[in-house]
């Protein structure tokens, strides 16, 4: 089918990187399609989820059925919250890692979004044939759009125009408190209160809410209702003319209309309010002839305001495909030329100046960036149909030192390459899966540390260490590894240092410390009472304590300076893995900082930088940094090998 959903920058024709896989995964069925070009969605097929052990199996079956051997980019709308890399469906037994699924299927890109977010992103591209206007009003171009989706729950969202794109709002507006507007709705509220401690709009105007209304009205009329009556049966009875069912539907539509009017006022949705989900669509003419529109406008002094806002019922058969298509197109656009990805912008700008052979490498990097990142040079050369020296020349044409440097910059430029959340390792994971999860979790934690680290505290810690008379590193258990590493680095500065992993040695040594001495205490939990008592003794004698630990712990609160390294690995029952890496990195940062201070005659950072620039050939100055492997001279490499 041709969807008519095109972005403002859409180009006619087929996608240069091949067909894109689109999916709409619900609790019962998984729907798949191919998008061959902007708005051209074909090969729509539906597969029962129960027939396939995993989502990966269902996707493979679809690709086999449509005879597609290679898909580069894919996007999935799923009826489930999506928060991080691991998705566990609440209405089906599928559970999967987004990144592991991408690797298993060989995709360059795999996006997974909530189905209601996808539905919201579909709205700007809907044609008149894919929606029915309910009542009057005229939508204002480039204005906020509202969306309600009465289905199993009551989804609420909005779209905000931003330049040439739309931003979808995340919302839990369906859980706003239900506010009855007449005596009949008062009865519904009273009945619902007997079942729920909080009666939200979702309780009464989502699909299951129709049953609540039906039973409340039956109780009013003293009618007995079978325990098996559900929303599907109520709708069928209403279509057949049953009086109680008709009143139930009318009440339901009125409540939904009142809520939609409130959403329109809240968002200022002059671009219109859309109704999605399956319930309203199944009501058909019962919905279009109901009091929905009248109740939408009935807002007292703002009735005239709402009269000008149109309301639409979404009738498109597969609206989620339109939304994930738009989201995927925006993601790929950002990657290939957006301001968020400087390396891709550089490739695009320089492409015409490259040799024909180098252009083939450039095209491979733009269209298949993960192939460049993951493959050895021999495979990259084969895929681009060039020689290996051509690959190296291409990298240097972009200002990179070589292929490794280019791979690093390319990986940094990829949007959404590394999941910024923790992925759990499960029994049965292959080495590829659990290996990638361990690496991804560590990289994710490092990136989050970079975003949240208090560098003012880092500067204070460096000043304290640089002026210390003696530095002692304390770590118990696994943290002793970090303490020993710190001792190895810092004794080279000519400062008396030692590392203790034994509590009794820590207590004995701390009792001898005083003013000018510094303890660097490394602890994952920050709660060991024995260590805290040792530090109290040293601080009372005038020593300072730098803590490398988690935030809001007793150690962090006691320390002179706390360098907080929060992460998902917080339970004391877990072996320190990620925390150990973060603590080692903090030691590296402190060591580099002290090295820079020591490169200056007076210890001041600005002068150290100036001297380093003026004396770039001075081996003695350069070696202060280079033995830490963060300098630039060849001398660093010799030390790093030891």
From Swiss-Prot:
Record-given protein name:
Bifunctional protein glk
Q: Region Glucokinase: what ranges? A: 1-340
As for subcellular location, the record says: Membrane
Annotated NCBIfam families: glk, PRK00292.1-3, PRK14101.1
Query: Mind listing where the DNA-binding region sits, in residue ranges?
Result: 377-396
Q: What class of enzyme is it?
A: transferase
So where does this one cross the membrane?
576-596
Source organism lineage? Bacteria, Pseudomonadati, Pseudomonadota, Betaproteobacteria, Burkholderiales
Quickly give the catalysed reaction: D-glucose + ATP = D-glucose 6-phosphate + ADP + H(+)
Which CDD domains has this protein been placed in?
ASKHA_NBD_GLK (cd24008), SIS_RpiR (cd05013)
> Residues in domain HTH rpiR-type?
341-417
């Amino acid at each position: 089918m041709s969807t008519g959903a095109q972005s403002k920058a859409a180009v006619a024709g087929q996608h240069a990187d091949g067909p894109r896989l689109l999916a709409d995964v619900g609790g019962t069925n998984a729907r798949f399609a191919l998008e061959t070009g902007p708005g051209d969605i074909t090969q729509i097929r539906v597969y029962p989820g129960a027939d396939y052990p995993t989502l990966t199996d269902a996707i493979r079956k679809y690709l086999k059925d449509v005879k597609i051997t290679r898909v580069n980019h894919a996007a999935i709308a799923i009826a489930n919250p999506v928060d991080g890399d691991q998705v566990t469906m609440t209405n089906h037994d599928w559970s999967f890692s987004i990144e592991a699924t991408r690797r298993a299927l060989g995709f360059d890109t795999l996006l997974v979004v909530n189905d209601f977010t996808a539905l919201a992103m579909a709205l700007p591209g809907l044609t008149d044939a894919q929606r029915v206007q309910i009542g009057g009003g005229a939508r204002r171009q480039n204005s906020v759009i509202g969306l309600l989706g009465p289905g199993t729950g009551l989804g609420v969202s909005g779209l905000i125009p931003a330049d040439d794109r739309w931003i979808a709002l995340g919302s839990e507006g369906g859980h706003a408190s239900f506010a009855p507007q007449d005596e009949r709705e008062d009865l519904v509220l009273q009945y619902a209160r007997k079942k729920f401690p909080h009666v939200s709009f979702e309780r009464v105007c989502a699909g299951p809410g129709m049953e609540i209304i039906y039973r409340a009205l039956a109780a009013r009329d003293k009618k007995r209702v079978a325990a098996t009556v559900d929303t599907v049966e109520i709708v069928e009875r209403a279509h057949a003319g049953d009086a109680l069912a008709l009143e139930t539907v009318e009440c339901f539509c009125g409540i939904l209309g009142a809520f939609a009017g409130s959403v329109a006022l809240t968002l200022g949705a002059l671009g219109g309010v859309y109704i999605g989900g399956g319930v309203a669509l199944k009501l058909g003419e019962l919905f279009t002839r109901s009091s929905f529109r009248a109740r939408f406008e009935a807002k007292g002094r703002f009735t005239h305001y709402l009269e000008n806002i149109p309301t639409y019922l979404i009738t498109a058969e597969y609206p989620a495909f339109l939304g994930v298509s738009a989201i995927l197109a925006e993601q790929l656009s950002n990657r290939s030329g957006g301001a968020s990805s400087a390396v891709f912008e550089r490739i695009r700008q320089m492409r015409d100046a490259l040799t024909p052979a180098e252009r083939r490498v450039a095209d491979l990097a733009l269209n298949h960036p993960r192939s460049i990142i993951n493959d050895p040079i021999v495979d990259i050369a084969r895929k681009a149909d060039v020689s290996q020296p051509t690959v190296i020349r291409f990298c240097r044409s972009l200002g990179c030192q070589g292929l490794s440097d280019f791979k690093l910059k390319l990986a940094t430029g990829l949007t959404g390459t590394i999941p910024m959340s923790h992925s759990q390792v499960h029994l049965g994971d292959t080495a590829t899966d659990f290996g990638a999860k361990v690496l991804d979790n560590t990289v994710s934690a490092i990136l989050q540390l970079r975003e949240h680290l208090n560098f003012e505290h880092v500067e204070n810690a460096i000043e304290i260490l640089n002026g210390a008379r003696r530095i002692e590193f304390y770590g118990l258990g696994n943290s002793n590894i970090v303490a020993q590493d710190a001792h190895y680095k810092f004794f080279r500065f000519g400062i008396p240092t030692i590392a203790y992993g034994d509590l009794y040695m820590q207590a004995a040594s701390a009792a001898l410390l005083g003013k000018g001495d510094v303890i660097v205490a490394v602890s994952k939990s920050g709660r060991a009472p024995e260590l805290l008592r040792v530090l109290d003794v040293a601080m009372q004698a005038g020593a300072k304590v730098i803590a490398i630990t988690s935030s809001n712990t007793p150690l962090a609160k006691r320390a002179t300076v706390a360098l907080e390294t929060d992460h998902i690995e917080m339970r004391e029952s877990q072996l320190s893995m990620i925390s150990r890496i973060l603590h080692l990195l903090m030691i590296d940062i402190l060591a580099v900082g002290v090295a820079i201070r020591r490169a200056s005659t007076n210890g001041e950072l600005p002068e150290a930088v100036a001297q380093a620039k003026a004396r770039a050939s001075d081996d003695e100055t350069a070696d202060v940094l280079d033995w830490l492997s963060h300098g630039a001279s060849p001398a660093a490499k010799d030390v790093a090998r030891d």
